[in-house]
């Protein structure tokens, strides 16, 4: 599809409908363990997954569509259509001058962690498959402007690799997983252990990126103070997420994963790019000081590995773009983060003009759409 606006957003979220899993899974087999929306005693509605109410102060995250950006829906009747209906989403994309949208979940967790936390592996696998099929059957089927990505069951490396193959075979263009699978589900190996190598090998073979959305690894971020109200907590959470992405890039490099799997492409959306120069400079410094080439067999500088295999995303920041040549203009993607409160919607064009005012045309096109088109193999 030819570009109309010259913008691809690589991090937007869909809202799963309340009956997604209940209409696709056996109530006789799974009962109330099926993910579903349940009215609470106070009249609000919340997602309940495997019998556990999902933590959070809302049913959905749609702040970009609220009048003050701070309020979130408490019942399904308050959820805007553009977050769950592809046709309404396309209208929102047109109004905000967005050509393509790479999709992430919401109720399932930004990286599928809410589904990944399910202890029963068979239930976890079935829930992941239902979500992945829905994305293809409803969103991808609505037109080529939606770029589908699959969540994977993390309770078993074998199951994760199998679902990755099945989902990509159906048309998914990326894979999503939590940044700390072992803390999401005790049955999962630590991300940096070689038990995950069969998955990395499958991802290389499938030739799709693996994506670690910011916020899916809370253990590597500062805790939110219990003294904060909901609005302040949301602001703090958005700022702290860069620390999580920096730690994940650090770990993916120093663990040797990206040295062993040289074709693996990793995306770190949702945390901006300002932190990247510090992270790369610190990694290179420690690589030299700790003699990691000699002692650990990490024969290339970490920054070289990053420039070969990692992507980061920008949306709100101007300062980070001034360091684009150190980060690598070919390693930066643009995102809207629709429909979350931190999204550029409905002012994406204005913010792009402001943030990219001193970026040359070639680099601007790289970041706004060419890199994403290459990564997701889009015919544009």
Language model feature labels by segment:
Residues 13-14:
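Di-metal (Zn2+ and/or Mg2+/Mn2+) metal-binding site signature of metallo-dependent hydrolases
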Residues 10, 40-41, 104-110, 150-155, ...:
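Short, solvent-exposed turn/loop segments enriched in Gly/Ser/Thr/Pro and often Arg
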Residues 19-22, 113-116, 222-225, 278-282, ...:
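Short aromatic-enriched loop/helix-cap "lid" or pocket-rim segments at secondary-structure transitions
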Residues 69-74, 109-123, 155-158:
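Surface-exposed, active-site-proximal loop segments in enzymatic domains
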